[in-house]
Amino acid sequence: MSQKILFIDRDGTLIEEPKSDFQIDTLEKLRFEKDAIPTLLKLKKFGFKFVMVSNQDGLGTPSFPKENFEIAHEKMLDILKSCGIEFQDIFICPHFENENCACRKPKTAMLEEYIKHELYDKEQSFVIGDRESDMILASNLGVRGLKYGALSWKEIENEILSSFRSASYQRTTKETDIKVKVCLNGGKVSIKTGIDFFDHMLEQIAVHGDIGLEISCKGDLEIDEHHSVEDVALALGACIKKALGDKIGIARYGFTLPMDECLASCAMDFCNRPHLVYKAKFKKSHLGALSTEMIEHFFYSLSYAMGVSLHLKVKGKNDHHKAEGLFKAFAKALKMAVKIESENLASSKGVI
């Protein structure tokens, strides 16, 4: 089974590399790079596995005795383990560059099993290192390389997470042309459906759900808003479902939210058994150019496209507040449900 793997360089990336001799052969030389450990802990929560790939020039020769190397190396691994970080595999090439061995980075001989058995997901795996050889290794593996030094560990974290749990989706019919982009870890918000009040409601999902959301819709508004609202819901739901991927680690569930004099509640379950229970009454037929009856239809279409069981209800006096409360409650429930809480799937069945 393909895994999300970070192939990580050691010296100069994970731990500081002494400029004097480029060898970490004493405990005094062992220092971690800033934010390396917290970043790896964060990425571990998102299901990434770690593989160390390091060139250690002349390891085992008189100039770099193996026992000296192992003292610092084992201490490093002990510290990482105490923090909750372990490497699935550790590959070390001990040769000098002029020996022209098959295993030295950027060659891939050390990773032959990973390549042969397709053990890493090329779309969701990365090489992290401080040298150009690491970037060439990334190219040889068919994954993206992130160069430490040009990027800090926090910037590397952001780069990885912005490409992870993200999706794009396009839905084109005779009635509408819709493009949606979702990043569940946050990002840009841009919504243009041609229905101002609907845009305002969709913005609540992005802002209060803390997600990046871009939606553009060209629809047959000269007829009415029905097709645009329905198809935006279908495209948005499909895009969120795509961004969630295998759903491993998500909380799965969530929320109740007061909105001025209103009380809106939303309960959500990413169970892949779509269902909607909706309890809301509006005095007005329209809010702006959006028919209030289309609010229920939006959530119905959205729940089926997302594959969620969705319970929504609101009570209050002001129709605008009630509508906004529903969208905000949905957003908060979504934020709670997609949050990574563990490394496991939240189901006793082993599948959602």
UniProtKB/Swiss-Prot annotation:
Residues 1-164 are annotated as: Histidinol-phosphatase. It catalyses: D-erythro-1-(imidazol-4-yl)glycerol 3-phosphate = 3-(imidazol-4-yl)-2-oxopropyl phosphate + H2O; L-histidinol phosphate + H2O = L-histidinol + phosphate. GO terms for biological process: L-histidine biosynthetic process. The gene is hisB. PROSITE patterns: IGP_DEHYDRATASE_1, IGP_DEHYDRATASE_2. Zn(2+) binds at C93, H95, C101, C103. Mg(2+) binds at D9, D11, D130. In the N-terminal section; belongs to the histidinol-phosphatase family. In the C-terminal section; belongs to the imidazoleglycerol-phosphate dehydratase family. Keywords: Amino-acid biosynthesis, Cytoplasm, Histidine biosynthesis, Hydrolase, Lyase, Magnesium, Metal-binding, Multifunctional enzyme, Zinc. This is Histidine biosynthesis bifunctional protein HisB. The active site is at D9 (nucleophile), D11 (proton donor). Gene3D superfamilies: HAD superfamily/HAD-like, Imidazole glycerol phosphate dehydratase, domain 1. It comes from Campylobacter jejuni subsp. doylei (strain ATCC BAA-1458 / RM4099 / 269.97). The keyword Hydrolase applies. Residues 165-352 are annotated as: Imidazoleglycerol-phosphate dehydratase. The keyword Cell division does not apply. One of its GO terms (molecular function) is imidazoleglycerol-phosphate dehydratase activity.
